[in-house]
Amino acid sequence: MADAERQIKSKARVRARGEVFTAAREVNAMLDLVKDETENIDSTFLEPACGDGNFLDEVLRRKLTVCRKRYGRSSTDYEKFSFLACTTLYGVDIMADNVAQCRERLFKRWEGAFGQGPKIQPSDFHDRVARAVKRVFEKNILLGNALSMKRVDDHGNDLDEPIIFTEWKFATGDKLKRAEFRFDVLLEKGAAKPGQAV
């Protein structure tokens, strides 16, 4: 099985945390059930046990394909809407190395999309956008326990801190507006209302 297709990192991790990764075939089959949402740049995805990002990486790949088709004629537009696609992805994992790998994997997916077409080249603002994308993944892919809805330390032990997600929206032009939401409050209410912050 290819490195990207391995389903476990070690037997010890399976015993300790029940960690098993979903193979690409299953990821695609499940995401195809909600295909329209995976191709909607604005649709939000939360993976409560994101591992190193198998699901989120494929969702981002699909969203970037849509961005390339719609906005690939303008580097500036492509950067803006590919950035927006990144802001819609959220993940939680109890393993610190998985969180770091997921963030890096998603950033590499976003960064790797440049140069895939004659028009999709980094704009003059690319470095700023790249820093913003990294910041989004730092805020959206979190070290935590989705069952207890709390942050965890580097050893997976619950802390007395709730998981807080950040919603990103364009206010005007390229200005961003952020709102924070507690995971437990979102689940308690069933669904967050747009713009409803904690």
Task: Set out the residue ranges of the language-model regions.
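SAM-dependent methyltransferase catalytic region
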Residues: 2-198
